[in-house]
Amino acid sequence: MANPLRGPCVRATRPHARRAEQGLPMKTLAKLPVTIVTGFLGAGKTTLLRHMLDNAEGRRIAVIVNEFGELGIDGEILKQCSIGCSEEEAQGRVFELANGCLCCTVQEEFFPVMRELVARRGDLDQILIETSGLALPKPLVQAFQWPEIRNACTVDAVITVVDSPAVAAGTFAAHPEQVDQQRRQDPNLDHESPLHELFEDQLASADLVILNKADQLDAEALARVRAEIAGELPAAVKIVEASRGELPLPVLLGLNAEAELHIDGRPTHHDHEGHEDHDHDEFDSFHVDLPEVEEAALLEALGELVERHDILRIKGFAAIPGKPMRLLVQGVGKRFDRHFDRKWLADEARSTRLVVIGQELDQAAIANQLRTALA
């Protein structure tokens, strides 16, 4: 299997000259703070990280992205800072760990990256880690107890991003209709759902919970979501509301939680499993390449697609005729968000590429349906 690491990469905001270059004595290096961002598929983790990078204010940040799927869409998004960023700066800031789950590949994938970043910690102020929406955060936090990491890094906080409208509708799971049917038949079955357990485990590991997409709910619905989430959390865990992950960096960084010291005392559903036997739901992922497409036609075609197939997540980029900017498309279930994220580069082919994630997918049928609808 080819090594999925694409590095070495560090965010290229470096306004502070190195002390050695100034002829100043070297200070003893403090522990490097690490923020772990977790949350279910489509909650808005990548959007949050992009907001943090765009507002870094000189902080030298390295990013590790753990994606599910063969196409590094999240890594590509994070390599683009605010519109107008130079192409040179846009490269070399992100490590991508693809086709895996950090909770299962800590030693073979995550550890080599951390070893490299530890060696370079004098050039860094912060590490951000975005986990896959299918990952368990607790084993990742526990990895920071290892001697080679714990002496150099500390987990400043685990931030869990929650899709507020999905929770309000009871549709954070991949198959809301099935969940509702199970809930009607036996309320206890929902709590034994692997997806529900994953959601609860992500909350159990949190030092800060973000109720994202809060602008899409009225005050009453948002209050219900807050109460539901608060019922899953220790009283000390703070809950904040956000729209598109837009929060001041002092809210997100500098929490000093030292989560690696306390994570063992946070019970989760998977504590008594041998992690080598940890079983994820079987998900398929593949990408579909298309030419330029009309925005309205694309959204209609994607809506029809999720009606006919067991699709959990669609994410990618689209080229819209006559538009100089690339359209970022992200969908969970029947809900699709889109916005223009940056201009097409001069040497970049204007094309559409979508990643589809789901269960028992007929890849040929899905690709043919899309191409026929958009022909």
Curated annotation (Swiss-Prot):
EC number: 3.6.5.-
Keywords attached to this entry: ATP-binding, Chaperone, Cobalamin biosynthesis, Hydrolase, Nucleotide-binding, Porphyrin biosynthesis
SUPFAM superfamilies from the UniProt entry: Hypothetical protein YjiA, C-terminal domain (SSF90002), P-loop containing nucleoside triphosphate hydrolases (SSF52540)
Catalytic activity: GTP + H2O = GDP + phosphate + H(+)
Pathway membership: Cofactor biosynthesis; adenosylcobalamin biosynthesis
One of the GO biological process terms: porphyrin-containing compound biosynthetic process
Gene3D superfamilies (alphabetical): CobW-like, C-terminal domain, P-loop containing nucleotide triphosphate hydrolases
Positions of GTP binding: 39-46, 104-108, 212-215
Motif (CXCC motif): 101-104
Residue ranges the record marks as coiled coil: none
Residue span(s) of domain CobW C-terminal: 283-374
Biased segments, Basic and acidic residues type: 177-192
InterPro entries associated with the record: CobW, CobW-likC_sf, CobW-like_C, CobW/HypB/UreG_nucleotide-bd, P-loop_NTPase, Zinc-reg_GTPase_activator
One annotated GO molecular function: ATP binding
Span list, region Disordered: 173-192
GO cellular component: cytoplasm
NCBIfam families: CobW
Protein's job: Zinc chaperone that directly transfers zinc cofactor to target proteins, thereby activating them. Zinc is transferred from the CXCC motif in the GTPase domain to the zinc binding site in target proteins in a process requiring GTP hydrolysis.
Similarity comment: family membership: Belongs to the SIMIBI class G3E GTPase family. ZNG1 subfamily.
Protein's recorded name: Zinc chaperone CobW
Naturally occurring in which organism (per UniProt): Pseudomonas aeruginosa (strain ATCC 15692 / DSM 22644 / CIP 104116 / JCM 14847 / LMG 12228 / 1C / PRS 101 / PAO1)
